[in-house]
Regions:
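Long, leucine- and charge-enriched amphipathic alpha-helices
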Residues: 160, 166-177
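Structural signal for interior beta-strand "rungs" in well-ordered beta-sheet cores
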Residues: 1-161
């Protein structure tokens, strides 16, 4: 299902998806593909079935080369007024709240929940099954491996509160370029 006033760039593939109104999908986006889920057995891995959908709510922009996997059982949801920069990957069952901005080359692993008004810097990675609160800012290149509460700014690997990060790395910050 594709809503009203949707812009679809070249080589975009949309399957198993519900697209809201006024959505922009730039070139080479792939939505609704099977996610990366396996059941590991002793001598073999069996692909886990994906029967959920991708839901893109109204007024979302998805830049070039983004991929959004369909949910395994639940849906993968991109909230209203959210912007995904180039080459962002959203894995199965991820839920992104409203008014969020996600910069280029971010990867969000399966079943993570991203709150409203979240900003994620480029090349950050978010591990699976995490909860990122509302009004959170994640610095570029950060590696998020634990939940982040509301109204928090983090950066680094592992991602930590920005004040703690700056205190721990002040020697590095003072180095000449």
């Amino acid at each position: 299902v594709i809503g009203k006033d949707v812009v679809i760039g070249s080589s975009v593939i949309v399957k198993n998806s519900i697209i809201g109104d006024r959505v922009v999908m730039q070139d080479n986006c792939k939505l609704g593909q099977k996610g990366f889920g396996f059941i590991p057995l002793k001598n073999k891995n069996i692909k886990f079935p994906h029967i959920g959908k991708v839901i893109v709510e109204d007024d979302v922009e998805i830049a070039s080369g983004c991929t959004i996997d369909r949910g395994s059982i639940d849906d993968t949801v991109n909230g209203k007024n959210t912007y995904l920069d180039n080459q962002v990957h959203i894995a199965h069952n991820v839920r992104i709240g409203e008014n969020s901005i996600i910069a280029g080359q971010v990867g969000i692993a399966g079943s993570s929940i991203i709150g409203n008004n979240v900003k994620i810097g480029g090349q950050a990675g978010i591990s699976g099954h995490l909860k990122i609160g509302n009004n959170v800012e994640i610095g570029g290149g950060s590696g998020v491996i634990k939940n982040i509460p509301d109204n928090t700014k983090v950066m680094g690997y592992p991602a930590k509160n920005i004040r703690e990060f700056l205190r721990d790395n002040k020697w590095y910050i003072k180095q000449p370029l």
